[in-house]
């Protein structure tokens, strides 16, 4: 079906760690988020091409991705991939402007979308019968320092029944790089 938002899993979630995409989609569905998929039209976001200096390949991939989202009738990309989020949120708008391409696409990390539903009282996590536990969150370089998404993942953790968020000593802007 057509929706104003499309879920973009990214290469890792689509081809390597598919449980990430499946869990993200299940969570978005459970929260009542209306979205569709690009399916065969989804390409790599172009991060590898950009960092390798393959500018022409990167530009082609970016143009194809923007066209695919627009052809789907969407104006919002929801992603679970930190690199895709960075590209759609920060890099694509800059390059589209530089190349004279109409962009007009909003990017949201799935944690932002679900946290909005929790805040609005439209979604809550069910009690799962697990013993109380403590959980921490690592702010990745792409999601944290580049896309500046710090609170939504924490809000979701805090919304989980019987789960306590414990902050690492180095968090948010001061989080250590994981080394990837």
Model-flagged regions — what are they?
Residues 1-180:
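Iron-sulfur cluster-binding electron-transfer modules in prokaryotic oxidoreductases
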């Amino acid at each position: 079906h057509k929706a104003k938002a499309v879920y973009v899993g990214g290469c890792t979630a689509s081809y390597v760690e598919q449980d990430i995409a499946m869990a993200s989609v299940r969570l978005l569905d459970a929260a009542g988020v209306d979205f569709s998929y690009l399916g065969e039209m989804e390409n790599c976001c172009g991060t590898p091409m950009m960092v390798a200096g393959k500018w022409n390949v990167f530009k082609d991939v970016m143009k194809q991705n923007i066209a695919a989202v627009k052809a789907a009738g969407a104006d919002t990309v929801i992603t679970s991939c930190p690199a895709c989020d960075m590209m759609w949120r920060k890099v694509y708008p800059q390059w589209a402007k530089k190349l004279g391409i109409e962009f007009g696409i909003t990017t949201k990390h799935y944690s932002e979308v679900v946290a909005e539903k929790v805040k609005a009282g439209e979604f809550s996590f069910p009690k799962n019968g697990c013993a109380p536990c403590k959980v921490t969150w690592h702010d990745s370089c792409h999601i944290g320092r580049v896309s500046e998404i710090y609170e939504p993942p924490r809000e979701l953790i805090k919304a989980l029944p019987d789960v306590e968020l414990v902050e690492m000593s180095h968090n948010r802007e001061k989080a250590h790089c994981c080394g990837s």
